[in-house]
Regions:
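Mg2+/Mn2+-dependent nuclease catalytic core
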Residues: 114-219
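Metal-dependent nuclease catalytic cores that hydrolyze phosphodiester bonds in DNA/RNA
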Residues: 1-125
């Protein structure tokens, strides 16, 4: 399959790392935190408790493996969607990518692929995996890897993050997304698609996430 790409003029943003927080600098010189920083903050205590429960050594090993798996699989997906030759990779990401191909081929008319976005209204920025049509409808699409399918209540922050990208994209271009899509390719052989159309619900949750983040950093 050959993927069609829509020519959208978006300016790439510079990134700045300040301690644990990643910022993006807009063309106007504003410095906005990444949406990933905000959504991660919301779940910070869950991960602190998990690390205490399993131990630092195991937690670091698990986290590093997950990061490596995700980065390598993302690269293969990106090449596929760019109609480029697929590079060689380790067996696991190759397997995760190949089993996802039939689902990836439901994507077309790609607006953004690994592109940076920002919102002056939200005072947020970030790098989105993909904005494209999925089954013929414009969507923010996030690619995830996992050992097995995750319950939806574990991944609320994925949907919130995607909604933020949708709002950023509308502010930048005037194009409104129809839905959020999480495409999760799993080590157990499952390829799971989570689709959400209740955008207003995730807009409200995003506001809560932002408030929680700002209250923490403002000492409230």
């Amino acid at each position: 399959m050959t993927f069609n790409h829509i020519d959208i003029d978006l300016q790439e943003l510079n990134r700045i790392q300040d301690g644990q927080i990643r910022f993006y600098v807009t063309p106007e010189g504003n410095r906005y935190p990444s949406i990933t920083t905000v959504t991660s903050h919301k779940n910070r205590q869950i991960f602190v408790d998990w690390r205490k429960r399993v131990g630092e050594e195991f937690a670091n090993r698990k986290t590093n493996r997950s990061t490596k798996r995700g980065t390598a699989t993302h690269l293969l997906i990106e090449h596929h969607l760019k109609n480029m030759p697929i590079p060689k990779a380790d067996p696991l990401p190759t397997y995760l990518f190949k089993q996802a191909i039939p689902t990836l081929n439901r994507i077309n008319n790609i607006h953004v692929l690994e592109g940076t976005l920002y919102s002056d209204q939200l005072c947020l920025a970030g790098q989105v995996d993909c904005i494209a049509e999925f089954d013929g409808e414009l969507a923010v699409i996030d690619f995830k890897t996992a050992e097995k399918e995750k319950p939806e209540d574990w991944i609320e922050h994925y949907f919130v993050q995607c909604m933020a990208y949708g709002m950023m994209y509308f502010e930048r271009t005037g194009h409104a997304i129809k839905k959020i899509v999480i495409l999760m390719t799993c080590e157990n052989g499952d390829v799971v698609v989570y689709e959400k159309r209740n955008k207003l619900d995730y807009m409200k949750l995003l506001k809560e996430y932002i408030t929680d983040y700002l209250d923490f950093h403002n000492g409230k």
